[in-house]
């Protein structure tokens, strides 16, 4: 569910191709946004996931907020977000996120969360209240919510996505064959059904897959077919990078030309929009995905 992690290990850094090298985040807008995030004690996936686009996005005054804490109940083998037993969530978080969005004058807001499997509603009420508060404080702001696997709790899913957001995203992360290794607590078929349910609720649907984990081209194309069949509108494809030596190693660095080909194939299969490139992450150019 969580957006793709992006900080390479020491060995990974030595062999990383030039097209994956990015500038350090700097600039007035980045500094201003960092101060606001710290002041309001907010979590961003930009920081927790060590996103390579943080400088570009924060420099433009945009960010992806992570609600329900920064400790996840899942232990996906690719993800840089901390895993463990989360503390109690902050009931004032919806208010603080909404205030930060208003102060930052965000035009398009992306909200995501860790998995909170220990909560009866999977955090659905906090999700709902956060979206509602953002809309109240900033009615002109459009919202994308990148939601977790709800383990077939469809009542909680409905509450989670009924706050007025324009786009609802749920990341597949990888191809079916690699699920047990990459997302051991998730199921490929269940995530597909979640996307189908989101579409049935009338939302614009979005998902992301990371490449370079050992998948084949045929497997990527099958995943595209499965997603189209389950009602997906927008797909993001990006390069997996190993967060630490404790995480899955990179099997392959996918060339930018291959990403470009995947984009054309995805569009030909019926997807409305495909964002595909080595540095693409779920929230990258999210304002274009409405």
From Swiss-Prot:
Gene3D superfamilies in UniProt: Aldolase class I
SUPFAM superfamilies: Radical SAM enzymes
Catalysis: reaction(s): [[Fe-S] cluster scaffold protein carrying a second [4Fe-4S](2+) cluster] + N(6)-octanoyl-L-lysyl-[protein] + 2 oxidized [2Fe-2S]-[ferredoxin] + 2 S-adenosyl-L-methionine + 4 H(+) = [[Fe-S] cluster scaffold protein] + N(6)-[(R)-dihydrolipoyl]-L-lysyl-[protein] + 4 Fe(3+) + 2 hydrogen sulfide + 2 5'-deoxyadenosine + 2 L-methionine + 2 reduced [2Fe-2S]-[ferredoxin]
The keyword Lipid metabolism is annotated on this UniProt entry: no
Cofactor names: [4Fe-4S] cluster
One of the record's GO molecular function terms: 4 iron, 4 sulfur cluster binding
Pfam families: LIAS_N, Radical_SAM
Location of the Radical SAM core domain: 58-272
Functional pathway: Protein modification; protein lipoylation via endogenous pathway; protein N(6)-(lipoyl)lysine from octanoyl-[acyl-carrier-protein]: step 2/2
Origin: domain of life: Bacteria
Major enzyme class: transferase
Annotated positions binding [4Fe-4S] cluster 1: 46, 51, 57, 283
Keywords: 4Fe-4S, Cytoplasm, Iron, Iron-sulfur, Metal-binding, S-adenosyl-L-methionine, Transferase
Entry binding sites for [4Fe-4S] cluster 2: 72, 76, 79
Keyword S-adenosyl-L-methionine: yes
Cofactor binding: number and manner: Binds 2 [4Fe-4S] clusters per subunit. One cluster is coordinated with 3 cysteines and an exchangeable S-adenosyl-L-methionine.
Cellular location(s): Cytoplasm
UniProt-listed Enzyme Commission number(s): 2.8.1.8
InterPro entries from the UniProt entry: Aldolase_TIM, Elp3/MiaA/NifB-like_rSAM, LIAS_N, Lipoyl_synth, rSAM
Cellular component, GO annotation: cytoplasm
Family designation: Belongs to the radical SAM superfamily. Lipoyl synthase family.
Protein name as catalogued: Lipoyl synthase
Lineage: Bacteria, Pseudomonadati, Bacteroidota, Cytophagia, Cytophagales
Designated gene of the protein: lipA
